[in-house]
């Protein structure tokens, strides 16, 4: 059932986006020929004021077709610039056209902002780690100061309760930071010159190896492991936390290992046989600490929501930058519709507020991707970019020039979509294997 809810949620986010284009087109007297919820052949359609409204079966999409979308094609065939109708997309000013393109992402931003406000006022439920840390890199520059299992109590005399608190009190710029740490019942204080980014590269949250769930037909299931079990060692190598496990599996060459785990105080040993080269065990670990943060007043909720939106957009822009500059590594994180629905479905199991919060972030991702991917004209950012350049030039590009830009952008867009589907399929195969 939660998969269906997640599909409907994704469809609703796209509906909000297309509604922005629709309303601004109506505002500027541009004829909306078709407004469709879903894609594919229509299962329900009706016409009001020269606009055909459709409901289509594939709810992982939707569109708003404005009059003038085929204008460039007509110009290309005629091999000359044609005069556009006043109620078409090419019959209005560049500025109005930019606003119509911008309206889709704008509505997603407004939707997320409003939802964040209500969630904050209702009491935000989310998950966090304790301030107990582990060293992510065995060659870490901070390993001389920190040890696996250290509990950070204070940073510059500011109390630390959760791992996310470290982001608030460790400066962005490299500077001298005082740490108060609890290590094996002993309080230790030391100074270290570090920036937040460098710190997070070297130090991560401590995650215990207590199993929350086991995937059917997985190596762990076949080995007899159950929820509540705690992994102790693999091939007699003691594993203290998830970082140890990830590091061990990353450097493992064998397909068969001996795993030891505890259950209700009793130690069990079993053979673990891997099905694929990625060494997927087939287990989910227990979630970190549950936190409830109550925002008491509207002004605080508005302020927190604004910074949450800005921070998310910065992360999206940085992700696009990584995709462009470090494609081989970043491309592994690209998800298609199946992966997106999977993420929403997983968040649903953590509670309704957490699920709604995830929907809001997904709405921000849709807005950010549409705005920042200016090289893809099928995205709003690409259309805005073209219209803005035409506004500066004082005249339109020739149809051939725009079509060349479209051809590259559509190819790149389809490539990203195909990459997302490939990653979705690979993820599904890993689960079923």
Swiss-Prot record:
InterPro entries referenced in this protein's UniProt entry, alphabetically: PDZ, PDZ_6, PDZ_sf, Pept_M50_Zn, Peptidase_M50
Cofactors required: Zn(2+)
SMART domains linked to this entry: PDZ
Compartments where found: Cell inner membrane
Membrane-crossing residue ranges in chain numbering: 98-120, 334-356, 366-388, 401-423
Family in the record: Belongs to the peptidase M50B family.
Protein name: Putative zinc metalloprotease BB_0118
Protein species of origin: Borreliella burgdorferi (strain ATCC 35210 / DSM 4680 / CIP 102532 / B31)
Species lineage: Bacteria, Pseudomonadati, Spirochaetota, Spirochaetia, Spirochaetales
């Amino acid at each position: 059932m939660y998969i269906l809810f997640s599909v409907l949620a994704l469809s609703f986010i796209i509906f909000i986006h297309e509604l922005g284009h629709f309303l601004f087109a109506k505002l500027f007297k541009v004829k909306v020929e078709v407004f469709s919820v879903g894609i594919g052949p229509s299962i329900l359609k009706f016409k009001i004021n020269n606009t055909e409204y459709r409901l289509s079966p594939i709810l992982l999409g939707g569109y708003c077709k404005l009059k003038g979308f085929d204008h460039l094609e007509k110009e290309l065939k005629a091999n000359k610039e044609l005069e556009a109708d006043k109620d078409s997309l090419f019959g209005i000013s560049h500025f109005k056209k930019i606003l119509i393109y911008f309206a889709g992402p704008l509505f997603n931003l407004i939707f997320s902002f409003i939802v964040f406000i209500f969630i904050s006022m209702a009491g935000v439920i989310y998950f966090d780690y304790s301030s107990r840390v582990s060293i992510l890199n065995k060659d870490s520059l901070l390993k001389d100061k920190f040890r696996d299992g250290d509990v950070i109590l204070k940073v510059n005399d500011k109390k630390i309760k959760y791992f996310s608190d470290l982001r608030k009190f460790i400066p962005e710029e490299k500077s001298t930071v005082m740490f108060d740490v609890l290590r094996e019942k002993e309080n230790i204080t030391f100074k270290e010159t570090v920036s937040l980014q460098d710190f997070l590269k070297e130090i991560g949250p401590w995650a215990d190896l207590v199993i929350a769930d086991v995937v059917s037909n997985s190596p762990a299931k076949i080995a007899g492991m159950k929820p509540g079990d705690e992994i102790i060692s693999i091939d007699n190598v003691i594993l203290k936390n998830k970082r140890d496990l990830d590091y061990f599996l990353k450097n493992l060459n064998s397909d068969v290992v001996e795993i030891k785990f505890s259950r209700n105080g009793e130690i069990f040993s079993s053979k673990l046989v891997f099905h694929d080269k990625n060494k997927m065990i087939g287990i989910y670990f227990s979630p970190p600490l549950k936190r409830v943060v109550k925002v008491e007043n509207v002004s605080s909720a508005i302020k927190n929501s604004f910074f949450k939106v800005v921070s998310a957009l910065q992360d999206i822009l940085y992700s696009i930058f990584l995709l462009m500059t470090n494609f081989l590594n970043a491309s592994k994180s690209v998800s298609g519709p199946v992966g997106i629905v999977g993420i929403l479905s997983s968040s649903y199991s953590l509670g309704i507020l957490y699920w709604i919060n995830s929907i809001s972030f997904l709405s921000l991702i849709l807005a950010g991707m549409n705005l920042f991917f200016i090289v893809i004209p099928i995205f709003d950012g690409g259309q805005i970019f073209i219209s803005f350049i035409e506004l500066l030039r004082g005249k339109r590009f020739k149809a051939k020039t725009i079509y060349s830009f479209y051809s590259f952008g559509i190819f790149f867009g389809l490539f990203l979509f195909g990459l997302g589907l490939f990653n979705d399929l690979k993820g599904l195969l890993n689960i079923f294997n």
